[in-house]
Amino acid sequence: MNAPKEGDYIAIQSYKHDGSLHRTWRDTMVLKTSENAVIGCNDHTLVTESDGRKWVTREPALIYFHKKYWFNVVAMIREGGVSYYCNLASPHVMDQEALKYIDYDLDVKVFPNGEKRLLDVDEYEAHSAKWHYSAETDRILKANVKVLVDWINNGKGPFSKEYIDIWYNRYQELAHHR
């Protein structure tokens, strides 16, 4: 499959460990692709939940996926500052249909003031027991929480102001030329 190009729109599909579709985001504009990473942006995009419920995102969000890390990052650009929602998840794959990954329940939320919260630990434990997450998967996910927290604490990659400025400005340029 040819990698999507800058300005192309892709869908994003989140699955659970058992292979069931969890959530779909309809339109994300690709801002950059490389061998390992995808950076994109969506704004007021349609989201469909596994139970069929639909809703629309409220603000622009930059997305970051990397094939070597077991997390992805959503930077929500709001009036009061940037909030981050980080999913502990498998590295992504891309096919003709969508960018796809397995959501492993654990999430890290970062507020504009820098406060961090680890979310959905109970959901992770329940699904781990239900779907028999391997010890290796558990080890990888816990190691990636540490990498993610290091990135957050040190303003690396998507957690830097420069990253947000560069990629959100690029999104605005591309969106206004359509």
Swiss-Prot record:
Name the Enzyme Commission number(s) assigned to this protein.
3.6.1.15, 3.6.1.6
Alphabetized, the UniProt keywords read: Hydrolase, Magnesium, Metal-binding
Q: What does this protein need as cofactor?
A: Mg(2+)
Q: Which residues form the active site?
A: R23 (proton donor)
Question: In which domain of life is the source organism classified?
Answer: Bacteria
For the keyword Acetylation, the answer is no
From the UniProt record, list the reaction(s) this protein catalyses: a ribonucleoside 5'-triphosphate + H2O = a ribonucleoside 5'-diphosphate + phosphate + H(+); a ribonucleoside 5'-diphosphate + H2O = a ribonucleoside 5'-phosphate + phosphate + H(+)
MF term (GO), any? nucleoside diphosphate phosphatase activity
NCBIfam families to which the protein is assigned, alphabetical: PRK13662.1
The protein's role, per its UniProt record: Has nucleoside phosphatase activity towards nucleoside triphosphates and nucleoside diphosphates.
Task: Please give the name of this protein.
Answer: Nucleoside triphosphate/diphosphate phosphatase
Classification from the root reads: Bacteria, Bacillati, Bacillota, Bacilli, Lactobacillales
